[in-house]
UniProtKB/Swiss-Prot annotation:
It is found in: Secreted. Pfam families: TIL (PF01826). CDD domains: TIL (cd19941). Disulfide bonds join C37-C71, C46-C67, C50-C63, C54-C91, C73-C85. Residues 1-21 form the signal peptide. Coiled coil: none annotated. The keyword Cytoplasm does not apply. The record marks K65, I66 as: Reactive bond. This is Allergen Api m 6.03 / Api m 6.04. One of its GO terms (cellular component) is extracellular region. Its main location: secreted. Expressed by the venom gland. May act as a protease inhibitor. It comes from Apis mellifera.
């Protein structure tokens, strides 16, 4: 049983690195360091893979809770369909 759990964990880790590109998913949360994030975004040492999206964005991208550096929307901003951080009021 423990071998199955270990193998599953390793496969999940490899999959998350391949999908996430070692720092983001789907074109955001890149490897850029502090000061290199796009407008309305901040660098986070541990939240780069899991993003907050506007309610009308369906389906939501996969969020794997593995600590990864990357750019995330500032407080009060959410990602729209174009993956740009916009004020919550402009989600549409």
């Amino acid at each position: 049983m423990s071998r199955l759990v270990l193998a599953s964990f390793l496969l999940l880790a490899i999959f998350s690195m391949l999908v996430g590109g070692f720092g983001g998913f789907g074109g955001f949360g890149g490897l850029g360091g502090r000061g290199k994030c796009p407008s309305n975004e901040i660098f986070s040492r541990c939240d780069g893979r899991c993003q907050r999206f506007c309610p009308n964005v369906v389906p939501k991208p996969l969020c794997i809770k593995i600590c990864a550096p990357g750019c995330v929307c500032r407080l009060g901003y959410l990602r729209n369909k174009k993956k740009v951080c916009v004020p919550r009021s402009k989600c549409g």
